[in-house]
């Protein structure tokens, strides 16, 4: 058997942060998606190249440089978002950052001209055409490949927590899906997407990538779209399960939670305390429960099938991380997360507004308003 080809793991500072936010471009009159990303990209004026095209021309991605903490992440996202919104307004457009557009039709979308996207379309056909979804991706700097895999396994239990806290996609193509996150059901249809394979060390990850590549299942490890995955080029662990979160302030509160959780799990590893790695069935079941019921779900807490209310599990976790939060300057972020985000999740707000108005256009307006309010744009 051929020995797996080594995959170099990049250098990064431990728990450095990089954040990617996928955005919807909205037409202010129709409230539908607005395919003008080439025009916006042509006019981009900031020196830092932290605005990127995405698979459709009605979609853009903003990302941060490497940051030390959430305060830096917030500053960078606000800076980029304000400039982007200025250009969008010039072109008669608005922005939203939640997980799905409430009523747009995927078969009306226009692909961005790119060899990468043409490859995805040819390879994945219907699955690629439906990628009208918007996520939040968080990169965490790791020591090395083995450390990255160890942390990935520690994070597996908390995937439903992050999905439920971000869930913002109850509507899809004009219908109430009955889910808190419909985006994740579209995302996991990708042939190398969804729940990660069980991996114990970096050598096993290299072996999986080699076999997938040899069998022409993927072109490179970039085609592995797991909910959480190593990102060797950056030397990071990338968390990809989250829906896009409405507004930059709420986004940074969730990033603060994730960053704090990483440091909490690292302390436990150093103390020799490791949570039992959840079985594959448990990871999948918890993901489904969070997708369906959001923060109201009963999450499985062990491989024996014991359950606990997810909101309570999150609050207990926050209590355990209270001292670290104070040390990192994250106390106010987490206070607002509990008082606002855990109390009034986006999927509930959107549904309540639709029930009150009967208009998905009003839902779109409210999501754009949230994005602009966070930027102090009148």
Curated annotation (Swiss-Prot):
Top-rank lineage group of the source organism: Bacteria
Query: What are the protein's UniProt keywords?
Result: ATP-binding, Ligase, Nucleotide-binding
Specify whether Lipoprotein is a keyword of the entry.
no
Which reaction is the catalytic activity of this chain? L-cysteine + L-glutamate + ATP = gamma-L-glutamyl-L-cysteine + ADP + phosphate + H(+)
Q: Which SUPFAM superfamilies match?
A: Glutamine synthetase/guanido kinase (SSF55931)
The region annotated as signal peptide is none
* Top-level EC class: ligase
Say yes or no: keyword Nucleotide-binding present: yes
- Name one molecular function that GO assigns to this entry: glutamate-cysteine ligase activity
**Alphabetized Pfam families for the sequence:** GCS2 (PF04107)
Q: Which PANTHER family match?
A: GLUTAMATE--CYSTEINE LIGASE 2-RELATED
Q: What does this protein do?
A: ATP-dependent carboxylate-amine ligase which exhibits weak glutamate--cysteine ligase activity.
Q: What name has this protein been given in UniProt?
A: Putative glutamate--cysteine ligase 2
Q: Which organism is it from?
A: Bdellovibrio bacteriovorus (strain ATCC 15356 / DSM 50701 / NCIMB 9529 / HD100)
Organism taxonomic ancestry: Bacteria, Pseudomonadati, Bdellovibrionota, Bdellovibrionia, Bdellovibrionales
């Amino acid at each position: 058997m051929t020995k797996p080809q080594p995959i170099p793991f990049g250098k990064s500072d431990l728990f450095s942060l990089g954040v990617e936010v996928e955005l919807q471009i909205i037409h202010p009159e129709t409230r539908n998606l607005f395919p003008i990303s080439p025009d916006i990209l042509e006019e981009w004026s900031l020196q830092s190249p932290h605005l990127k095209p995405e698979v459709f021309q009605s979609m853009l991605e903003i990302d941060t440089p490497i940051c030390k903490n959430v305060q830096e992440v917030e500053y960078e996202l606000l800076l980029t978002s304000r400039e982007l919104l200025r250009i969008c307004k010039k072109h008669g457009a608005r922005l939203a950052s939640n997980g799905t557009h409430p009523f747009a039709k995927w078969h009306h979308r226009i692909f961005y001209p790119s060899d990468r996207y043409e490859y995805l379309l040819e390879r994945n056909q219907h699955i690629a055409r439906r990628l009208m979804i918007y996520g939040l991706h968080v990169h965490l700097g790791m020591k090395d490949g083995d450390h990255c895999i160890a942390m990935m396994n520690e994070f597996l239990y908390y995937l439903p927590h992050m999905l439920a806290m971000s869930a913002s996609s109850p509507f899809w193509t004009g219908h109430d899906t009955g889910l808190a996150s419909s985006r994740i059901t579209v995302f996991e249809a990708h042939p190398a997407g969804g729940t990660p394979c069980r991996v114990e060390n970096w050598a096993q990850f290299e072996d999986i990538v080699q076999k997938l590549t040899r069998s022409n299942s993927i072109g490179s490890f970039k085609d592995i779209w797991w909910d959480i995955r190593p990102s060797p080029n950056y030397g990071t662990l990338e968390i990809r399960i989250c829906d896009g979160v409405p507004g930059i302030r709420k986004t940074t509160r969730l990033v603060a939670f994730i960053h704090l959780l990483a440091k909490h799990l690292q302390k436990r590893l150093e103390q020799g305390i490791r949570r039992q790695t959840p079985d594959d069935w448990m990871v999948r079941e918890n993901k489904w429960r969070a997708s369906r019921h959001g923060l109201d779900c009963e999450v499985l807490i062990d491989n024996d099938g014991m359950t606990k209310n997810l909101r309570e599990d999150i609050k207990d976790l926050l209590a355990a991380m209270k001292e670290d939060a104070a040390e990192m300057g994250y106390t106010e972020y987490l206070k607002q997360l509990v008082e606002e985000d855990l109390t009034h999740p986006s999927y509930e707000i959107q549904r309540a507004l639709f029930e009150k108005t009967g208009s998905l256009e009003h839902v779109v307006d409210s999501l754009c308003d949230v994005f602009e309010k966070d930027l102090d744009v009148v």
